[in-house]
Amino acid sequence: MRNFNIKRQINKLYTLTTVSYFRIAGASWVALLALRGFSLLQIGILESIFHIASSCFEIPSGVVADVFGRKRTLALSKLVSVLSCLAMILSDNFGTVAFAIAFSALSYNLESGTIEALAYDSLKSVRQEKKYNRYASTEMMLYRVTSSTATLCAGFALWLGYKKAYAIDIFFGMIALGIVCSLREISGFTGADGQPTNPQTDEHNKEQMSEEKQERMNEEETDQKNIQNIRISERFQNVVTESWHFMKNNRKARSVMIVNALIGAVSTLVLFFLQAKLPLAGLNEALLGPALFVMGLGAALGAKVVGYFPNWKYKKYIILSGIGVLCAFGMTFSGNPYLMILGGFVGSFADDFLEVRTDILLNDMIPSEQRATLISVNSFTFSLVMIVMSTLMGSIM
């Protein structure tokens, strides 16, 4: 690809991850809602609404990325994220908050699988796809460090209040949108827009043409638009059909997605419930933010360490991560806040240790044409597991 600087593209993707996930309001949304007077039951229902909306949007958003292009889909994701924050600022009751939460889920869905697909295809376009292992590890580490840093700012977000906190998220969302616009699209997608035109020039030219030429040109323009619409429709159909056949005939991919979702759901919910259990276990509330930050560093470490074991069989990752998550789950019942924090650290480490390897494995298995769609199927599987596990673990813990 001419004039394509792969290093610049990858660095922009790293920067995008760093900017996108520094959301001080998003990282402390539970505490902000509680501060506004919402009950834990209402917050739990809103969490379910997020995952239900996510499960509805996940696969269609992947199809959109495969059909219209990764860059456009990422730009739409950032725009929807900004609108979600704006909706949260304007919300004044449970219904409007639920609407904002659903919009937030759509933003995550549009990004899920898309940034990974763009990174992989960028490297593949210059025959450097073997470097995706290192990219995935570093990207996951940046995501965890950034999101953990945002969590560390939870006290600051509460001090600011939800409106100012979400305004800061909007600011970083606009920066992220600017970064997306500077990215290079890789694959030759057929878009929905045509060539740019100058209306005044077109009108002047038409006046000098004969009526026959005008009619012929209009017919050609109409035919081109019809062909474009047919191509988009066919691409939607082909992506969905081929993705379905891939999942139906690839038992290994299905198994990988399910196991990854189960381990990831347990780890995620352990961290979620520790936000409530740590203060009850005697941890000073002022230390809650730093405690969550430390646990998040476990995930960053797990994402980075996985790069040192590229030749391990996938079963080894499953066994090690499974043991780590089970230990984390057990430590939440110790009653000792420091053991619980250690458990959260271990669980986060195990989760991302498996997650990064799963991402690499699936990208190697998936055809480029359906990459975003099938990675979205992976996220969809996680959402379904979360809907069930949230209630189950909530009753146990």
Task: Label each PLM-derived region with a short phrase.
Residues 18, 95-111, 339-353:
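Hydrophobic core of transmembrane alpha-helices in multi-pass small-molecule transporters
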Residues 165-182:
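Symmetry-related core transmembrane helices of the 12-TM Major Facilitator Superfamily/SLC fold
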Residues 46-47, 56, 71-74, 272-397:
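C-terminal transmembrane bundle of multi-pass solute transporters/carriers
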Residues 35, 147-168, 279-281, 386-397:
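Transmembrane alpha-helix termini and helix-breaking/packing motifs in multi-pass membrane transporters
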Residues 79-92, 323-335:
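C-terminal ends and interior cores of transmembrane alpha-helices
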Residues 2-55, 250-293:
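Helix-loop boundary and gating motifs at the non-cytosolic
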Residues 1-7, 186-257:
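Juxtamembrane intracellular "pre-TM" segments in multi-pass secondary transporters
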Residues 102-143:
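Cytoplasmic helix-loop-helix junction between adjacent transmembrane helices
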